[in-house]
Amino acid sequence: MKEKTNKSVGNIQRRGFDQLTWVNPKQVLINYRHLELNFLDSLDQKVRTLRTNKLKEWREARDAALFSYGMANEVLKTPVLVAKSEKSDYDFIMKWIIEEKEFYCPVQLKELPPDDINPNIQIENIFEKLKKYCGEHDLLVSIKINREIKSFDLNSFKNKENLKISELWYFGCLNPEQSKWFLYGSILESNPSQYDFAYPKGKQNYVLQ
């Protein structure tokens, strides 16, 4: 991953990145879990799981934080910041610093939804839609596997040569308590690896008004 995202960005692109709001994905996840445990329990299930149209942005922000936090802890082994951006072909950007040099990685976020939400969507449908992207030098695609992981074949993707993206990763939950998560990738490599990580714990820092 580090080798594929270490190219310097142009001054114009860097200025655009500097104007984004960068946040710590770990703190985003801690704040959300605190809200979930203390305020959301009595609400409708669609609201609790952020499955309404109005809450879609929140759900995607949480997924972006989950993926970025896992990558920071298990793959990059260095702190990562994340910023929302829906320009071009990506939903958010990860940023980290190694030896005083800034690295950026644009990420397109996809989801294989739960069977009770949309059982008709299969992973092959998502693979087919990925063919439209052209970011072989820097674009990373992350697919959230929101189904029972025991019944999902992590090695089901075969037509790697048809994609013009830099990397392809899966991530998802490993237990009902949502305390254990995994990353799997890059799927475009010959030997993808699985990385397991725990949902972060800590003190919330938001203020309700």
What does each model-found stretch correspond to?
Residues F92-M94, C105-P113:
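Conserved catalytic cores of phosphodiester-cleaving nucleases, focusing on short active-site segments
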Residues M1-A83, L112-Q209:
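Charged, structured surface patches that assemble and position nucleic-acid processing machinery
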Residues V75-K101:
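Long amphipathic N-terminal alpha/beta scaffold segment
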Residues T52-L55, K101-V107:
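A broad, low-specificity signal for short, low-complexity segments enriched in glycine/proline
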